[in-house]
Amino acid sequence: VDEAVEERLGAPMRTLVVGRDPRLAATAREEAERLLRLDEGIVTLGASQPLDSATASAIHDARTRGAVVVELSADLSAVSRRENLGVPRSVGLGAPRAVLTQLMRQARVAYEAVADTTVDTSVLTPQEVADEVARACKLTPDY
């Protein structure tokens, strides 16, 4: 979805988020709905997208048409490491780990309602994650 949003809005996702582009939420919802209507392929949603009721409904519709929904998760330690939240920062920036913890809880609840399975990526390599997703989706006879 991010790539479709970037293409449509003509800017990198980081710029759109940091700049709080007012078109971002609606465009992300529209692109998620459009991509989830396709009959084949892999759609990668942002972690918070199932929190949007229209997107959650589109995910449910895709599941009724046979789509498999796989949530990719990671523990707080892994996400903090990946996002460099362990580096020193100004006290004025607040508590990013606390904010992240709350966001992760919200996303987890939303995904519980729509995901068929969850792959914990905390200690897996990208190839291992791909293998687990392929296995969950039964994409090849090997799985």
Region spans (language model):
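Short, flexible helix/strand-to-coil boundary loops that buttress conserved ligand/catalytic motifs
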Residues: 9, 17, 36, 63, ...
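Conserved substrate/cofactor phosphate-moiety recognition/catalytic segment
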Residues: 1-33
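Glycine-rich phosphate-binding loop used to anchor ATP phosphates in small-molecule kinases
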Residues: 23-68, 72-73
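Short, flexible loop segments at the rims of nucleotide/cofactor-binding pockets, characterized by
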Residues: 19-23, 46-47, 94-98
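K/E-rich alpha-helical interaction surfaces of small helical-bundle regulatory domains
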Residues: 14-22, 105-116
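A glycine- and Lys/Arg-enriched "phosphate-lid" helix/loop adjacent to the NTP-binding pocket
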Residues: 64-110
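NTP-dependent small-molecule kinase module
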Residues: 68, 108-143
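Short amphipathic alpha-helical segments
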Residues: 54-57, 81-84, 131
